[in-house]
């Protein structure tokens, strides 16, 4: 989170995080598949591009560049020893100010990865 790798059970946000109260966040839902040559993130570049476009539309400048987000995604998968997983990059207005005007709240970035079978269940 915000450039640091945080153990799953230690990841947290402040209770007054702006996004929790006003929904000021954007995210992507991405799959990583196990292949013969190792884990493969489905359309990583396209998902990162869409995340940045969504952030721009919401006036949330991402404090990292696109390549840093792509590489952080790959490193997060590797550090968690996953070969097939779900990826949730999230850009959100963090703790620091409350109220309807969000532009003074800092922009935070998190990338979560976890094992997840078939999206619609094993038969779907």
Residues of each region from the PLM?
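Conserved alpha/beta cores of soluble small-molecule-handling proteins
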Residues: 1-124
